[in-house]
């Protein structure tokens, strides 16, 4: 029985998600920075960093989490330059994450950092979106295996398409090794979201 259009689209969407590039990003991150940075209670790698910026991000967060809340200034930090009010924005402490974890402050340990996981997410998004962008530019076009039953919908590719797919994986590998990403994550953690440029490109190509 022929596959419905909906079933075909589901099969292709499952196939297209570039998990390989995201996995490459995770492996490169762990190879460069190690597993210790993912420990939420480990702040030594931040405070002992040769660059002062990561310490600024972390200390800004620690002061913000202990700062009183006076509506409507939910992002205000009253501890950083007491007695004056400043904002968590100015310490580059990843404000959205800082706001989220401030809400969870009652269950968090006394020392808590989320910058290691932020870095891992940046590397994975860099790899995944890089593969998605390159695959779209290269014209990777998998097709549904119509001989499969509905329960085992598959995807088939020509040798040329397979080569293009592996080329997109190689390209993703190069972009997760991008020196600017490594430098930003190491010295200016809040600026490591290079993947935002790739996301913009991907959305433009999709349109």
Predicted regions and their residues:
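Start-transfer (signal-anchor) and selected internal transmembrane alpha helices
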Residues: 1-40
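Short, basic, low-complexity termini and linkers enriched in Ser/Thr/Gly/Pro
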Residues: 2-10, 139-153, 157-163
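Membrane-interface coil-to-helix junctions
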Residues: 28-125, 178-182, 188-193
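Intrinsically disordered, low-complexity segments enriched in small/polar residues
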Residues: 41-42, 46, 73, 137, ...
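Secondary-structure transition/capping motifs at alpha-helix termini
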Residues: 106-111, 135-140, 165
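Membrane-embedded helix bundles of polyisoprenyl
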Residues: 117-137, 164-207
């Amino acid at each position: 029985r022929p596959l419905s259009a909906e079933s075909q689209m589901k099969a292709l969407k499952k196939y297209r998600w570039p998990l390989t590039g995201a996995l490459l990003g995770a492996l490169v991150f762990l190879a460069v920075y190690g597993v210790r940075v993912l420990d939420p209670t480990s702040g030594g790698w931040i405070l002992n960093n040769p660059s002062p910026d990561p310490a600024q991000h972390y200390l800004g967060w620690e002061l913000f989490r202990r700062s009183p809340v006076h509506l409507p200034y939910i992002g205000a930090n009253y501890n950083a330059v007491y007695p004056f009010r400043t904002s968590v924005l100015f310490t580059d402490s990843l404000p959205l994450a800082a706001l989220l974890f401030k809400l969870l402050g009652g269950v968090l340990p006394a020392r808590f950092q989320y910058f290691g996981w932020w870095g891992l997410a940046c590397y994975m998004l860099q790899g995944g979106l890089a593969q998605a962008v390159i695959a779209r530019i290269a014209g990777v076009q998998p097709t549904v295996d119509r001989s499969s039953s509905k329960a085992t919908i598959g995807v088939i590719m020509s040798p040329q398409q397979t080569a293009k797919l592996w080329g997109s994986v190689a390209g993703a590998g190069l972009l997760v090794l991008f020196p600017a990403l490594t430098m930003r994550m190491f010295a200016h953690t809040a600026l490591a979201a290079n993947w935002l440029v790739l996301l913009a490109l991907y959305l433009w190509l999709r349109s």
